């Protein structure tokens, strides 16, 4: 025993001396060469050892990427105080330090060996470790260093900010152990824990692994055994009594560039207990290293290529502090990019999932709580390893670049909302719409126009229907848009027509609403815009009591259900029975027709009202029947029987016109050809094609040189809104408009042309603008070559007497027939009796054109007289017909139908005569025109923004160019619309402004195109009787400019009978035939070209094929 004791004391003395020498060194005995030699180490070696500690592999004797094993050795030593301490030493080669990790795949900014690792961590302070009676073990509870990216490091150098201000440091009270603790017990515990886990891991990764991490130690002396027993007792007490101080204090930061090799690190805010999850929810850390290896999904960071099998710490957001226990208990894995890419198995083995090895590699003893946490983590890691599929490392996921972006704290920014295209909000931006929160309390519907009394305006914003109000925003010419708010409590009736072609709602309100609207919209009779809600005008009260909203399209079932439910709720709220009613298409169409006629009939003089009183019931019904046919918005047959067809099938190109090598060819497809079916709207391709066809095929060379036709897209592009551009901020709105189309006229000077044609499309409706004589600065009068003064005076007196006598005889002979009386009365009340020009009476009989015209008029009058009275004599009817025909021609301004000595005949007269003689249907149409025509209807509803309107009381000589010695050519803009509706003054204004800028660009000087210089007018032109032929009428307007040219441009202008309406019934088929014929011709040309240049077949065979193709 004595010898044993002496031997033990001698060993203790030797051990204490070696420990004293070790403590005297700068690194406190922790160096790269673990031995008890007396060699000194440099400060640089100490720095490198600190770096090596961070990359120590946890498996004992595990192979590195270079095939070398790590030597690990455990010893029990005693300090000068007589305490026995367990130390574990691991030697790591310097070549495996972080020097080789520069430019690693995860984008981390690793430091070289000449820099301390603490300079690149988030906190420069390291844990002070465990102190055993004055002996400080530096790496007992070392915080896992979180390495920052290069971007964060550069930011820290600029801002000196590493933590958010609310993150505070948690100080740790070191654990002090009493002397003579049971070291052997700690060894035994550690060996048992590793022997339970490592065999399972060895089976999983199928690699040879040692059952124990520690090498066998020599037998301990009895004194050492006694110390181990004491340590075991202390360990049980520590599990219950030892607690760590979690008091927080201000965060102490040191400069990231001040630490030197011998400088001691300070405490960090992460303890052993917090790291292993005992107090996870209270850990005030802002960066958590999460290495959940359950799925082995390897993500790229900072755009670097990831190595398969490399473990990347996940830097989470500040909101993710409260992490579950399982996340923090995941194994912590550190690896470098010098691992072999092809040796995945060795890499898996070298990166141990056991945190126990990492703990045991520290020279400080483990407490009971730490040991329990290690065992728990080891078991969980083993279960996760079992669930990993064998090929999981091959299945890598690559995130987009934007998803990999990080903010200044290393947090992901993929939650940043993406910039989306601007869409119209379903709720209005003002406070009124905020009251409509429920989808069944409000609905937003697209409406095309509104009519209040005789006021007609287009809408620029969708209409909002709510339980409390209806919000309408309409366009006001030359002013800012007007917003109307109708309180639903003031409504008394709502009638709804929801058919596909005419979705319209009729609202009725109390008189105060109409008065408010009259003031807000500035409605007055001087401007011929008013509403008569109080019944002052008995004839128009019914039509003017509505507030009419015409929708853009028919409502789908869900929208219709919401709309009707809102209207019903309004009726219940107002306590009005039968508040909401549905009306059929016929009634809705009739009301719209009546509203259109209301304006025209209202502006008539008292003469027109007296004339209405004289009309009989039969004649009145005939007028109403024709009015319905003329002004009906839609054909009833089309609504009830014919539906729009939808083009189905592949789109094939039919023709290119003009064909190559000509420039500016327009491609026409079979889908475009489908637009020529009855009831379909013409598209821009057909419009542009036919206008170009007219110029190139039908017009004479001199006529084509006098005109310029813009594309149907010109006005849309001119008036198109664009995003703000810094280059155009200083330009006016007129210059911005012109800039969009400035290249359209780079090869043409439009001011050298006589006519500029601009097809326009607004609200799915085609109409035509004609800029006449843009180069003239003032009206120009020229002698009328067809004017003969003597013939006019002589013929006027002769025809006037004959008209009076014949009319008187007709009065006597037809006095017994009440149905004919209105017609005769109407003729006697005319202001003028128009003369028929004829210098040579003998030429009347010899001229076949005169005979042909008289025959057609006789045919038309026969039908009139037959309708008026079957007993009327034929000669009297002939006299009446001559008078009516003469008057009709004079009032309508048909220059070509005057029978002058110059024998002037143009295209319109030929067309009219042909249609009159070909069918009885054309005669019936002429009959309707003759009966219903009245001088008071001249130039009705002509409107313009400059006030140059048609006069109601204009004489019948207006438009009679052949009765005046001069003809007028003046700059003007004519708007030809086949559906007489709103004033297009804004269109005229925009075209004027374009001409001003274009003149300045082309001529280099400024010129005014104001309303005094360039007048605007809406001439009365033939009107369509359906809702789909507007494009066809636009094409005919252009064609009639050359078939029946306008010689005098005095305003106002009446072109109501410019061309016969029956022609429009065959216009679509005419255009279709032109396209098909061009297709056939171009197909033959292609075949001819192919056969001519074919070298595969012999010459004779090729010629035969060409002949056959021509015959086909």
UniProtKB/Swiss-Prot annotation:
MF-aspect GO terms: SUMO-specific endopeptidase activity
Organism the protein comes from: Homo sapiens
Name of this chain's protein: Sentrin-specific protease 6
Enzyme Commission no: 3.4.22.-
Biased composition (Polar residues): 891-902
Keywords on record: Hydrolase, Isopeptide bond, Nucleus, Phosphoprotein, Protease, Thiol protease, Ubl conjugation, Ubl conjugation pathway
GO biological process, one term: protein sumoylation
Phosphoserine modified-residue sites: 42, 335-336, 350, 352, 919, 1111
Major location category of this protein: nucleus
PROSITE patterns on file: ULP_PROTEASE
Subcellular localization, as worded in the UniProt entry: Nucleus
One GO CC term on file: nucleoplasm
Reported tissue expression: Highly expressed in reproductive organs, such as testis, ovary and prostate.
